[in-house]
UniProtKB/Swiss-Prot annotation:
Residues 19-100 are extracellular. It comes from the Viruses. Keywords: Disulfide bond, Early protein, EGF-like domain, Glycoprotein, Growth factor, Host membrane, Host-virus interaction, Membrane, Secreted, Signal, Transmembrane, Transmembrane helix. Cleaved at the cell surface by host ADAM10, thereby releasing the secreted form of VGF. The record marks 96-97 as: Cleavage (By host ADAM10 protease). Induction: Expressed in the early phase of the viral replicative cycle. Residues 41-81 form the EGF-like domain. Disulfide bonds join 45-58, 53-69, 71-80. Residues 122-140 are cytoplasmic. GO terms for biological process: epidermal growth factor receptor signaling pathway; positive regulation of cell population proliferation; positive regulation of mitotic nuclear division. GO terms for cellular component: extracellular space; host cell membrane; membrane. It comes from Vaccinia virus (strain Western Reserve) (VACV). This is Pro-Viral epidermal growth factor.
Length: 140
């Protein structure tokens, strides 16, 4: 994993941690100490961000320069360009699990059918190969 992706991952974690909270900035000087109004940690991109994110919202982080994407459900990637496969999507209900692995019983039946088919084919080939041709019987 390159350093660029690690930095992007770290930035995404920061963006998510500040996504729902606005933080007040406090300015101090020797004479004046006051709290300013809340500045949102992230804000949506303006018209310059239209079309930047393929399946999500374009956002600007307060502490980080550049545009980032907040992907819609089922998409991932820097610009939300990758579809998350159905097998790997988390269910909306955390108590349910979805398994796409065939049960051992089905696997055993399939393996058994394959073995029986191979045995029958080998017996058929062996008997066909060893069958002696019928010789004409000559009556004296």
């Amino acid at each position: 994993m390159s350093m660029k992706y690690l930095m992007l991952l770290f930035a995404a974690m920061i963006i998510r941690s500040f996504a729902d909270s606005g933080n007040a900035i406090e300015t101090t000087s020797p004479e004046i100490t006051n709290a300013t109004t809340d500045i949102p940690a992230i804000r949506l991109c303006g018209p310059e961000g239209d079309g930047y994110c393929l399946h999500g919202d374009c956002i600007h982080a307060r502490d980080i320069d550049g545009m980032y994407c907040r992907c819609s459900h089922g998409y991932t990637g820097i610009r939300c360009q990758h579809v998350v496969l159905v097998d790997y999507q988390r269910s909306e209900n955390p108590n349910t699990t979805t398994s796409y692995i065939p049960s051992p019983g089905i696997m055993l039946v399939l393996v058994g059918i394959i073995i029986i088919t191979c045995c029958l084919l080998s017996v058929y080939r062996f008997t066909r190969r060893t069958k002696l041709p019928i010789q004409d019987m000559v009556v004296p």
